[in-house]
Amino acid sequence: MTGAPGSRWSGFVNDCLYTRPDVDTSDQSPNREYWAHGDLMHKGAYFDPSFEFMNSPESEWDKPFSGTGYRVIKSHTFAFMLDRLKEHGHDMYLIHRPDDECYEWWHTAGGWDITYPDYRRYYWDNDGMKDQIRLQNKHILDFVKQEGLEGYDDGKRTIYRWRPPTNTRKNLTETG
């Protein structure tokens, strides 16, 4: 799962993936939640440089989980490694919103006051955040074009799904 900060990917995950009975939600705990305006905005582990877990598939994906089923691995910076991630054979969701909408929503959701995950050490300041949103969105859209993916606009964001060939499919982030 990838999307730039402010892409509203957490809402998609909460509404469409965490509600499935076959999804492992054992990564969720009170210290991995962020609430704003009375709404639960973030829950579960996030994988990115300077976050609690790094985005390295080889060593980090299993760390926050103890259950079974499909695992939702969320990383903003997966946008930079989509071709490499294809080789793992898992379904991937890519969430996109225009750069300015991402930036505005991220600030509306709490911006630098977001307590989980902590964006300050990787994105640094507003200019750094704008640059990263632009770069992450560019990489996502380049991959979408390269793979010929069609998106679904749910009124909040555009959702793309990449699926590996059926003989290599592991779906979401199934272990094993």
Enumerate the predicted regions with their spans.
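PAPS-dependent sulfotransferase catalytic domain
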Residues: V72-T175
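PAPS-dependent sulfotransferase catalytic core
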Residues: M1-F65, G176
